[in-house]
UniProtKB/Swiss-Prot annotation:
Class in the EC hierarchy, top level: ligase
Species whose genome carries this gene: Humulus lupulus
Sequence intervals crossing the membrane: none
Name of the coding gene: CCL9
Binding site for ATP: 171-179, 311-316, 395, 407-410, 501
Location, primary (coarse class): cytoplasm
Residue segments, region SBD2: 312-375
Family, as annotated: Belongs to the ATP-dependent AMP-binding enzyme family.
Name of the featured protein: Probable CoA ligase CCL9
Entry's Gene Ontology BP terms: fatty acid metabolic process
PROSITE patterns given in the database record: AMP_BINDING (PS00455)
EC code: 6.2.1.-
GO MF term list: ATP binding; CoA-ligase activity; medium-chain fatty acid-CoA ligase activity
Compartment annotation: Cytoplasm, Cytosol
Comment text on domains: Both substrate-binding domains (SBD1 and SBD2) are involved in the substrate recognition, and are sufficient to confer the substrate specificity.
Length: 525
């Protein structure tokens, strides 16, 4: 793959090649063609330049999934500035941290709501403006308006460079301190091309974005990969995922695929079981990423919606995609595997940096043009992550004889019970094969005898009744004795991140905090 490509260059090429095809649709309201979207983005970029935004400046954005957000995101990177998307649900204290850590110069929000972000920006003396798109298909208006006169010529004179940092995000992994991840035009361009290639995205495709666009999964896999392919993207009218409107949106836009985290797949499945739609669109594939998908859930999805479910493997530091199960015509998928590397080198290394043979586990390591050059202002994290010429993901996995990657778990999440290393993903899969369980997550807890013991939290299916003894009996039939959870928490909800991911650290802290005598484990630094 060429190392001189840029995301903005790919978007311009698509706008020229597929000028009259639909690019963005807002459910039940309006749509923009690829050419019109490019015009609106260039105009918004001219406003940012007139407002003093320049090369390398960090611009924070906090919006629901709206057309204004997409336009402003693309306009920021067109200016050779850095987009720093933030979750609108953050508290004022969280906004303070993220705005400060990213060194944001400007905050852009909708005219109403998100008061916590405004308060944080004010406290940090960061300029705040609002963005609106009157009528949905007009031109962006900023308030207050720029002091200087805007000029499209100034935008045309800009040349985006592959080395330009365009996106700044924070990780939300197993450590408690989020790490800042700068991603360049080359990183983003490489990733979207990888996604387009492995799923054969084209101008004939269409999808509904169900994930928040402040996260790489929704932004890169759902939105940007579609745009560079000339595809169409529908935004739900509510600005976020809604199970009640999901299939009507999919049918209305002639969707051919969608991507989601396992939690959303389960919500979609549960609605199908309890309130099925009269008809479903014919999908080329369903994609799952950002957390492990149990084979039983994959099977139910395929049976219910008649499309192959392709599980993928991704992380922020790789500008999202690292590996994916291929389409049926390219080799097919393996339940329980996250597929083959896509557009980058991948190796399974031991602690000394030596490659492991197929079937032997080690740390998953990658290198390629999609991978970040390093965390911002964090030499300790960079030293740990970049060794032997590879980026170390912190995940344990192995390749099978066919070259498919199987993940065992996060290094810091593997449960060490008296010297036996247990994969919580394996325990999850068994729990989710129970016919009366809708969701489940296993996690490690401190134990005086074994060092660590296994607990789990489960959500029963609607209308089902389960008890702890029944769940434990099921586990004893399907797991080795040392892998059986010691305690089962039965609940109606699990704590999730803003992107719908279930993190074991957070789940463990949540349930152990309910037991006054429990010692809450310490994870990471």
């Amino acid at each position: 793959m060429a190392n001189n490509i840029t995301l903005t260059g790919l978007l311009k090429k698509a706008a020229a090649e597929f000028s009259d095809r639909r690019a963005i649709l807002v459910s039940g309201e309006f749509h923009l063609t690829h050419a019109r979207l490019q015009e609106i983005v260039d105009h918004a970029a001219s406003l940012l330049l007139a407002s003093g935004v320049g090369h390398g400046d960090v611009v924070a954005l906090t919006f629901p999934n709206t057309i204004e957000y997409i336009v402003m995101f693309l306009a920021v990177i067109r200016c050779r500035a850095v987009a720093a998307p933030l979750n609108s649900a953050y508290t004022a204290e969280e906004f303070e941290f993220y705005l400060s850590d990213s060194e944001s110069k400007l905050l852009i929000t909708p005219p109403k709501g998100i008061e916590a972000a405004r308060a944080a920006a004010s406290k940090l003396n960061i300029t705040h403006v609002t963005a609106t798109l009157p009528g949905g298909d007009g031109l962006i208006a900023l308030s207050p308006s720029p002091n200087n006169e805007s000029s499209l010529d100034a935008v045309a004179e800009l040349t985006n460079d592959p080395s330009d940092v365009s996106l700044f995000l924070h990780t939300s992994g197993t450590t408690s301190r989020p790490k800042g991840v700068p991603l360049t035009q080359l990183n983003l361009a490489s990733s979207v091309q990888n996604i387009k290639s492995v799923y054969k995205l084209s101008e004939s495709d269409s999808t509904v974005v169900v994930l928040p666009l402040f996260h790489v999964h929704g932004m890169i896999a759902g939105l940007l990969s579609s745009l560079i392919a000339g595809s169409a993207v529908t935004l739900p009218a509510a600005g976020r995922f809604s199970a009640s409107t999901f299939w009507s949106d999919m049918i209305a836009c002639n969707a051919t695929w969608y991507t989601a985290v396992p939690t959303i797949h389960q919500i979609i499945l549960d609605r199908h079981l309890n309130k099925p739609e009269p008809t479903y669109p014919k999908l080329r594939f369903i994609r799952s990423c950002s957390a492990s998908l149990a084979p039983t859930i994959m099977g139910r999805l395929e049976e219910s919606f008649g499309a192959p479910v392709l599980e993928a493997y991704a992380m922020t530091e790789a500008a999202h995609l690292m590996a994916s199960n291929p389409l049926p015509e390219d080799g097919g998928h393996k339940p329980g595997s996250v597929g083959k590397p896509v557009g980058q080198e991948m190796a399974i290394l031991d602690l000394n940096g030596s490659a492991q043979l197929p079937g032997f586990s080690g740390e998953v390591c990658i290198r390629g043009p999609n991978v970040t050059k390093g965390y911002k202002n964090n030499p300790e994290a960079n030293k740990a992550a970049f060794q032997f010429g590879w980026f170390h993901t912190g995940d344990v996995g192995y390749f099978d004889e066919d070259g498919y990657l199987h993940l065992v778990g996060r290094i810091k999440e593997l449960i060490n019970r008296g010297g036996e290393k247990i994969s919580p993903i394996e325990v999850d899969a068994v729990l989710l094969s129970h016919p009366d369980l809708a969701q489940a997550v296993a996690f490690g807890v401190p134990d005086d005898k074994y060092g660590e013991e296994i607990n789990c939290a489960v959500i029963p299916r609607e209308g089902s009744e389960v008890d702890e003894d029944g769940v434990l009996r099921f586990c004893k039939k399907n797991l080795a004795a040392f892998k059986v959870p010691k305690k089962v928490f039965i609940t109606d909800s699990l704590p999730k991140t803003a992107t719908g991911k279930i993190q074991r650290r957070i789940v463990a802290e949540h349930f152990l905090a309910q037991i006054s005598t429990a010692k809450v484990p310490k994870f990471g630094a």
